[in-house]
Amino acid sequence: MLLEINNLFFSHSPENNLFRNFNLKVEEGKTIALAGESGCGKSTLLNLIYGLLDSDEGEIIFQGKPILGPKKNLVPGEDDMKLVAQNYDLMPYSTVAENVGKFISNINLEAKKEKVQELLTVVGLEEYASILPKYLSGGQQQRVSIARALSVMPKLLLLDEPFSNLDFSRKIELRERLFRYVKEKNISLLIS
């Protein structure tokens, strides 16, 4: 099992229990969509899984290792897990291609260039490679962030409302490309 959540409890305050005895298992290469109304805890769950928040009780196990929150682990995240949050955290003075290639090794520059191009194609931004992110729309910045997360080939990709800034036709197109890509690469996807 790639990810296991066992008996998770979490609340923002004593009267606001978001999760009570929550359990989830994610197998390698599987896609799971989290559905629910605004404020129901989808983003909070992704933040708990990534280690950005401490749970009240229970455990989150990724690749056999416990995921600890900030009280016990100063640097959140795991090498084989990436979170694309609703704030995109792009480098504003680096091009789209440089943002996507940020975590790809420079040892083989030709291979890096090919990988960046492949990922830009997945998110439909190949013609924007030399543009600075500050000139992109919110939806385009969102797609750059997804491509950058995919660049490290994580075993688990956490996407927090990844299509929220896209129009309907772009949303469908990106979802199809993204789901096909993660299936081909055997990447597990947890999407809110």
Which role does the model predict for each range below?
Residues 50:
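Helix-to-loop junction immediately C-terminal to a conserved catalytic motif
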Residues 58-69:
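Conserved ABC transporter NBD signature motif
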Residues 67-82, 106:
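ABC ATPase NBD coupling module
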Residues 110-128, 179-180:
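Conserved ABC ATPase "signature" region
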Residues 132-136, 140:
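Conserved ABC ATPase signature
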Residues 151-155:
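A short, proline-enriched helix->beta-strand linker immediately N-terminal to the Walker B motif
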Residues 157-161:
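Catalytic Walker B motif of ABC-type/P-loop ATPase nucleotide-binding domains
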